[in-house]
Structure formats: structure tokens, C-alpha cells
Amino acid sequence: MWTALVLAAIVAGGAVAYGGWAYLAVGHGAPLWPFIVGIPLAYLAIPLLLTIFWFVLAWWFRAERPADIHLALPARIAMFGREFRALARSAPRMILYRWLMPDPKPAPASLPILLLHGVGCNAGVWSGFRRHLEACGIGPVYALSYGPPLASIEHFAEQVAEKIGDIEAATGAPQVIIVGHSMGGLVARAYLRQFGGAKVRRLITIGTPHHGSMHAWLMAGMSLAQMRPANAWLATLNGNADGADGVPAVSIWSWHDSMVTPQTSSRIDWGENIVLTGIAHNALLDDPIVWAKVVEQIGRAATSGSPA
């Protein structure tokens, strides 16, 4: 709710300011058509500038990459375009998250999926991802919007525990599969550390900064502070040899992540790593390759039985 309200206020404020400017300009003889054409351009300018900014930072703090994953210029342009598209889609998705991501109707189920979003987002960012899972016959698929946005990761983990309880009550399923994007993976791990892994069949993280991200230094908030490299909270979380507290885990990450820096921060040594190239941070949620990898992992979890 918090993120949707903030975004809606920003969009509404921008629309009022833009409309007022257009009204005054047209009143003084300016043509109307440039302002009409400028409506989508004004909106798209924001994700464009953010995409450029994140890519510059990602290059500056980049991890040393193997020579064989170098991207040619056309591939780099395509990657930039996909990330820009993902960011441009995110605001309307998050504003409309209650309509796009309602909980499934209560019904018996064997292995529900729970999606956990990253910092500053809400369940709306998963809308395309969930549609694909459901099209593959996977479900029921739930998503949690936790908040307030900049609270501690432990606070979010408590909300995950409540959500898992709600899912169990609605489906009768004793376990869920958790899929976490970005900070969502850390929220899942914090849940496992606080509440144990008895109710989680498998943990799938996507673009999660398991060892922190330099980008987190640019923003304020408790959850951001917990994602800064080498901070005490992360050191404690990573202090156990098993970072998922006995739950089978996989980290899906990209050498070209635009917000996890260095990109190798997503690498884990207590689970499986699925390493991709040519996909930036937000575009991971809309990428067919990532979808296929997650579907495969869910299938493996469904046939593996409950962990001991």
C-alpha cells in the first residue's frame, strides 16, 4: 500500500504540474499539440534517466567478468532497452497492484508459491511473472506487499510468517516455495533464520544481493543499510555455513545486473547458482529465460518431497 500511495501521489502531482504548465502556455498562445505529445515523453523520461544512472553505477562497481561473456554493442543496447521497459512498466503495475495481484481464492493445494518483491516495490512487479507461472499450470501463486518500505528486513520477515500462515489456512498446504527478487531473497532468508524452514520446500532467489550491493549506499532506510556490503547484519546472516537454514536453495543471477554491485554478490556457496548474461536487474522478472529456470526449479521441488 505504501509504495502504491507514494507512486500515485508522485504521478498525480506531476500530472497537475504538467497540466498547469500546459494551460498557462496555451493561454499565452503556445500550440497545444506539443504538450499532448509530451505526456508520454515526460513519463518515460523518468525511467530512462534511472536506467542510465543505474547502468553507469553498475559499470563503475562491476565485478570482474570472464572474457567469454562480453556483450557486443547490439546486445548491450537490447539489454538496456529491456531494463528501460521493465522500469517503465513498474510504476503502473505497483499503483494497480491490488487489481493485478489479488490473492487466489481459498482452495486445497499441495504446494503454493509465495513471491517476495525487492526494496521500494510491491507485489505489482510480479504481475507478468505470475501470469506465466499460472499459464504453466503452477499455482496457486501468492505475492506479499510488505511495508513500510524502508523498515527493517526482520520486520518484513515477520509479515512473511503471517502470510505463510494465511496461505496454509487457505490451502491446507504445510509448505510453500518462496521466490524472492532482489531484497526479497534476503527477506526470505531472514524469515528462515527467525522462524525456521519447516514451512518452506525451496527458496529461489533472483538477483538477490546476498553479500550486499554498493547501490544501497545511495539511499536511506533500515533495509537499505542492511544491504550495504560488509555490514554487521549481513555478516550475521551469512555467518552460518547454510545460508538457507536447511532449505534447498538456488540463486539465479546475472553478470550484467544493473543494481546488484558487484554482481558476484548474488553468488552463494550453500546452494545452486544459475548464472545468466545480458539481463539487467528489473528485467529479470520479465525475462523468459528466468521464467523457464524458475518453472524448472518449482518442478524439481514438487517432485522432491518434503525436506527432512
Residue ranges and their predicted role:
Residues 114-124, 128-245, 252, 259-260:
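Serine-dependent carboxylesterase/thioesterase catalytic core
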Residues 152-153, 279-288:
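Catalytic histidine-centered segment of alpha/beta-hydrolase-like enzymes
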Residues 255-272:
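Conserved loop-alpha-helix segment in the C-terminal half of the alpha/beta-hydrolase fold
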Residues 299-308:
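Generic C-terminal helix-cap and adjacent flexible tail
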Residues 255-256, 278-280:
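Acidic beta-to-alpha connecting loop that harbors the catalytic carboxylate
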Residues 1-113:
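Flexible, membrane-associating and regulatory peripheral segments of lipid-active enzymes
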Residues 285-299:
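Post-His helix in hydrolase/transferase enzymes
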Residues 109-111, 244-249, 268-272:
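Short, proline-enriched alpha-helix->beta-strand connector loops that line the catalytic pocket
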